[in-house]
Swiss-Prot record:
Coiled-coil ranges from the UniProt annotation: none
Domain ATP-cone: 49-139
Annotated source species: Clostridium kluyveri (strain ATCC 8527 / DSM 555 / NBRC 12016 / NCIMB 10680 / K1)
Cofactor field: Zn(2+)
Molecular function via GO: ATP binding; DNA binding; zinc ion binding
Source species taxonomy: Bacteria, Bacillati, Bacillota, Clostridia, Eubacteriales
The keyword Cell membrane is annotated on this UniProt entry: no
Protein name in the entry: Transcriptional repressor NrdR
Family as reported in the entry's similarity comment: Belongs to the NrdR family.
Nucleotide-binding listed as a keyword: yes
GO BP, one annotated term: negative regulation of DNA-templated transcription
């Protein structure tokens, strides 16, 4: 790596440690020519993930959309912010562990519902009602019957 001070191409690593969020490695380097020290960061290159929406348009994956949907579904329910974050983490991990560069929004919705069902059934039904666009009370009842029968 080129020294930012003199441009020399060789250095030695003096110190190496993970950043606080564990998403990168911070390295202190020393130039072998001018002996000045500088910091570099090494991190995994993220390939942007595209979400294919119902209308077939594409947009970049946005974790905050998952969090916002979960927050609405869990409003006034005994679900902590930590649990909501864990669900978002779980969904994001499933997505990033796949080799896909595009994913359908419906697949993301199903992953969210699968995780939410384990945490709070009422929040699950709320999320499902918006996500699956329940049209009437019969659709609600059908979903609740499925939930009860799968216990």
């Amino acid at each position: 790596m080129k020294c930012p001070y003199c441009g020399y191409g060789e250095s030695k690593v003096v110190d190496s440690r993970a950043t606080d969020d564990k998403m990168a490695i911070r390295r202190r380097r020393e130039c072998l020519k001018c002996n000045k020290r500088y910091t570099t960061y090494e991190k995994i290159e993220n390939v942007p993930l595209l979400v294919i929406k119902k209308n077939m348009s594409r947009e970049y994956f946005d974790r905050t959309k998952i969090l916002n949907g979960l927050m609405k579904a869990c409003q006034k329910r005994p679900v902590s912010r930590k649990q909501i974050e864990e669900i978002a983490d779980e969904v994001e991990k499933k997505i990033s562990n796949s080799v896909l560069t595009e994913i359908n929004s419906s697949d993301i919705g199903e992953m969210i519902m699968e995780s939410l069902k384990k945490v709070d059934e009422v929040s699950y039904v709320r999320f499902a009602s918006v996500y699956r666009q329940f049209k009437d009370i019969n659709t609600f009842m059908e979903e609740i019957k499925n939930l009860i029968s799968n216990r």
